[in-house]
Design a protein with these regions (language model features):
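Gly/Ser-rich helix-loop-strand patches that form or flank binding pockets
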Residues: 21-66, 149-201
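A short, acidic, amphipathic alpha-helical segment used as a generic capping/interface helix at domain edges
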Residues: 118-119, 137-151
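Charged docking surfaces used in two-component/phosphorelay signaling
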Residues: 12-23, 136-144
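Active-site rim loops that border cofactor/substrate pockets in soluble metabolic enzymes
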Residues: 121-141
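Short glycine/serine/threonine/alanine-rich loop segments
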Residues: 7, 33, 93-94, 127, ...
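Short acidic/Ser/Thr-enriched loop-to-helix initiation segments
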Residues: 59-125, 181-183, 196-201
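A structural signal for isolated positions on well-ordered beta-strands in alpha/beta enzyme cores
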Residues: 12, 68, 94-96, 130, ...
């Protein structure tokens, strides 16, 4: 996979409990690189290859052919543009840009900015970047609850981590914790920082 032996992407393994997942999320709060979280559930019945800092875990290889990219109304969602474009170019993966079903225009504006970036890079490099836009059932506040049951054969979910934790996040866990806990595929996260690490050629 693209994160194997890739110093530009941090790889983390954890258990499936809320506490184990939150421990990883807390450890990565200041991470400038994208980071992939793989739980024991995925190691047991999915096909992924990778190394952690402490132990080496090897399973069967698989191809990264489809990436699910949910897009909400939050401004930091546009940070996904560079990362998903990079992943698509390096792996040839098809991007499913899943827009939150909001009444307002912010999610639509964010996804259009991501599409514009994809098209700009495609025109500049002459490479074909495969993508499609779909609309979720849920809005920006609930879209994360439908990702694990989304009817697409994706091998990775790309999320933006919460900028700050509110009361609900402290009590019940942030949205990214829910997605990781229920997902059957690895989840890649990027932290919304002004000095966000950019993957480049």
């Amino acid at each position: 996979m693209i994160w194997d032996n890739n110093e530009d992407i941090r790889l983390e393994y954890c258990g499936t409990s809320k506490r184990a997942i939150q421990h990883v999320l807390d450890a990565c709060r200041q991470e400038r690189r994208p980071y992939v979280v793989i739980t024991q559930k995925e190691l047991g019945d999915q096909c992924y290859l990778g190394k952690s800092s402490k132990t080496e875990r090897t399973t069967k290889e698989t191809n990264l052919s489809t990436i699910l990219v949910p897009v909400t109304m939050l401004e930091e969602e546009v940070y996904k543009a560079e990362i998903c474009t990079y992943l698509a170019r390096k792996t040839g993966a098809h991007l499913i840009l899943l827009r939150a079903n909001d009444y307002g225009s912010k999610a639509k504006r964010n996804i259009q900015r991501i599409i514009t970036h994809i098209q700009t890079i495609s025109e500049r490099t002459g490479e074909t970047i495969s993508y499609e836009e779909q609309v979720a059932k849920g809005d920006s506040f609930s879209i994360h609850k439908e990702l694990h049951n989304y009817p697409s054969e994706h091998q990775l979910v790309l999320l933006t981590a919460s900028r700050e934790y509110g009361l609900d996040d402290w009590l019940f866990g942030p949205p990214e914790q829910y997605v990781i806990r229920h997902s059957n595929v690895p989840v890649m996260l990027i932290n919304p920082r002004a000095d966000l690490f950019s993957l480049c050629d």
